[in-house]
Swiss-Prot record:
Source organism per UniProt: Homo sapiens (Human)
Disulfide bond annotation, renumbered to this chain: none
Source lineage: Eukaryota, Metazoa, Chordata, Craniata, Vertebrata
Self-association state and partner proteins as the record states: Homodimer.
Protein name: Bisphosphoglycerate mutase
EC number: 5.4.2.4, 5.4.2.11
N-acetylserine found at: 2
This protein's UniProt keywords: Acetylation, Congenital erythrocytosis, Disease variant, Glycation, Glycolysis, Glycoprotein, Hereditary hemolytic anemia, Hydrolase, Isomerase, Phosphoprotein
Binding site for substrate: 10-17, 23-24, 62, 89-92, 100, 116-117, 189-190
Catalysed reactions, semicolon-separated: (2R)-3-phospho-glyceroyl phosphate = (2R)-2,3-bisphosphoglycerate + H(+); (2R)-2-phosphoglycerate = (2R)-3-phosphoglycerate
Gene Ontology MF, one: hydrolase activity
Length: 259
């Protein structure tokens, strides 16, 4: 039986989403479409009478800004927002900044799919010579984390994302849910997929088939042990959501004209 409700989402679209590049830990902002997605998400949640007690985000701007826009639409700007690197997007290592379609041309669609969607496959690590290395690791937000800078990831599989996310879920978010708080998690495609895997008990093999579009609220109903009661539900126009999911899945494919 359902006892708790949790809302999570992948942030609204950013410039690099539109350019089909691996964004990861680069602090790209929402574009105009992404801001509109976030506002629409807020409107949907308002129509469903959601009143949040606490919001959790990553330390990346696109996650935080999405949460702010949602709260603004809800008229709940006063609700506390807590940010942690443990909700950050998956660290794509050496792939950061690269175009997914170009990678599919160079390495094949299946390899790109494994890098993007599989559970255990880790991309090559980021090196100090990488054009975005200094931007990431010299950023002040990563000098005040709960782990030393040299212990932050240089590349991650989805398994790695779940392992760094779970302590934060268990120690910070889950206790608030168990207290009956209504929680919103504004995160990223892979940190959200990792949490869904844990809460829904999705297998290592099946998680590759879970794709999340930007800016769409996801409802999870949880039992007293914080396990999902049934599959997650996308809230909104289901036809539009399926089209958005297909768009995300096609990002790692070579367009027909180029084959």
């Amino acid at each position: 039986m359902s006892k708790y409700k949790l809302i999570m989402l992948r942030h609204g679209e950013g410039a690099w989403n539109k350019e089909n590049r691996f964004c990861s830990w680069v602090d790209q902002k929402l574009n105009s479409e992404g801001m509109e997605e976030a506002r629409n998400c807020g409107k949907q949640l308002k129509a469903l009478n959601f009143e949040f007690d606490l919001v959790f985000t990553s330390v990346l701007n696109r996650s935080i800004h999405t949460a702010w826009l949602i709260l603004e639409e809800l008229g709940q700007e006063w609700v506390p927002v807590e940010s942690s690197w443990r909700l950050n997007e998956r660290h794509y290592g050496a792939l950061i900044g690269l175009n997914r379609e170009q990678m599919a041309l160079n390495h094949g669609e299946e390899q790109v799919r494994l890098w993007r969607r599989s559970y255990n496959v880790t991309p090559p690590p980021i090196e100090e010579s990488h054009p975005y290395y200094q931007e990431i690791y010299n950023d002040r937000r990563y000098k005040v984390c709960d782990v030393p800078l040299d212990q932050l990831p240089r590349s991650e599989s989805l398994k790695d994302v779940l392992e760094r996310l779970l302590p934060y879920w268990n120690e910070r978010i889950a206790p608030e849910v168990l207290r009956g708080k209504t929680i919103l998690i504004s995160a990223h495609g892979n940190s959200s997929r990792a949490l869904l895997k844990h809460l829904e008990g999705i297998s290592d093999e099946d998680i590759i088939n879970i794709t999340l579009p930007t800016g769409v609220p996801i409802l999870l109903e949880l039992d007293e042990n914080l396990r999902a009661v049934g599959p997650h539900q996308f809230l909104g126009d289901q036809e539009a959501i399926q089209a958005a999911i297909k768009k995300v899945e096609d990002q790692g494919k070579v367009k027909q004209a180029k084959k």
